[in-house]
């Protein structure tokens, strides 16, 4: 075994050197805090090995917020470099590494875990399930994601980050990118992608088989509908990515030639593989985001969602078309007029079902009794901003015009107007909206609104000038420019906008910390002044009981809970409760994640034997699990009755208080 020790440390960059010095102290400090407060046993037994979908969801969200910080720092470094002409703040290769990792982190390790966290917390509650279909697999999926996240972030201080862009095109990512950087990209995304594929299968089966029997597909809440359709995209889109990553890994480590022209390979094969996954990936994160908006807008408009069935069909239409547009990402690569024309038309067609959704949200708002809580503000801001992203997308869909726009900042502005307003706004809105369901108290609304205004205004100040920069010819991925180019003022404005966005995010962090100590606790579960419309608001707050529902709820309309409250009925009346069967926690996912992290690290540095040993460790863990006799455990009926009685008493007090105020 010849480990390449000479590649381990990145040298010659003061910023990376500071990170290399600071990272060990950060890890030691974290270990010291956990040890001092004697939290190791608690964390291992209650969180790391938990199969409770709600706790797994919270772990996803914690990781997503941390990756938001990391990706945001990358973005600020990019803007700092481009603020003034001929800047020497970053050298070219380091700049390439930063924009490459920024894209991967924000899409793979921020947006997706944010969405998966909300899936885990909300979807089983919305369909009346006690857990997901495969609780152990859910735990394994999280740790696979976590292993990929850790590996990818190690690249900054050990070995060097990938510098071939988030698309990692061959041959740039092949013979022109020596060292472990691209290997980090391939292995980390491969491991995380396996967890994503498992999550997609898990939630597909959960929604199909674990929903309450009286709930029909067209009666499901829109967040659950968009989740179900998204799982189909995950199941169909991730295998091509898995194959592509595996092929490029063998090219780099075992000297095959799938993407190397000199030996008969096809670099364009990578582009097709990548975007067959890459464009559906956009809808993997944006369709659940549409589902979030479809929950928030009716809640704070105090109206039924307009055109529920058309929203379902529009979601299905977008999912179908998402697999027919991938070539628009490389119109400029010589496909020919006929192929470009087909994919140009199919790209424009996506605007039709998306337009249906936009009009339905607007008609839901029409004559509604709207209140402007912070989740609603994000949802309202999404509509006009996303529309701008969509209109510029149609401009880019015109293949002939795309030759002018494609490699400029016009494209950068376009996809940020779609992904930030479509996904990031939704993630922040969803986090605030369902935060009481996780923690039992609302985040401070004043701080939330400061977060919204800084983030939304900063976003437009940052990215609107980039449309003009693109039309003025500024290429994307450019690490510096000359004063004579005339781009200084717009780049300065763009950087100011990025700083405003960072301040907005800091307000959210302050809100989380402040609310932990100051916000009043709520036990009733229907936390937004009794405006909840779906099943999750019928359960207790502060991580609902492990069993979620003491009895199987009835559900015959997507607004059933509103009807029940109007008629004074709820699910918490006295019942003859029975013992409830639940799955046991398991360490399997945690140890598979550890083996994956260690094995992946050795494979990144092309040291195969230790990686194989870790692979045997993974198989051994799986064999150990297969021979376990684990029948789970039962929550006694008396304990269920006591828990439900407390919740019923809290609900009665809430209704009495509301009646007294009125």
Curated annotation (Swiss-Prot):
Major place of residence: membrane
Reactions catalysed: 2 a quinol + O2 = 2 a quinone + 2 H2O
EC number: 1.10.3.-
A Gene Ontology term for the protein's cellular component: plasma membrane
Record's subcellular location: Cell membrane
Names of the cofactor(s): Cu cation; ferriheme a
PANTHER family: CYTOCHROME BO(3) UBIQUINOL OXIDASE SUBUNIT 1 (PTHR10422:SF35), CYTOCHROME C OXIDASE SUBUNIT 1 (PTHR10422)
Protein name: Probable quinol oxidase subunit 1
Organism this protein belongs to: Staphylococcus aureus (strain NCTC 8325 / PS 47)
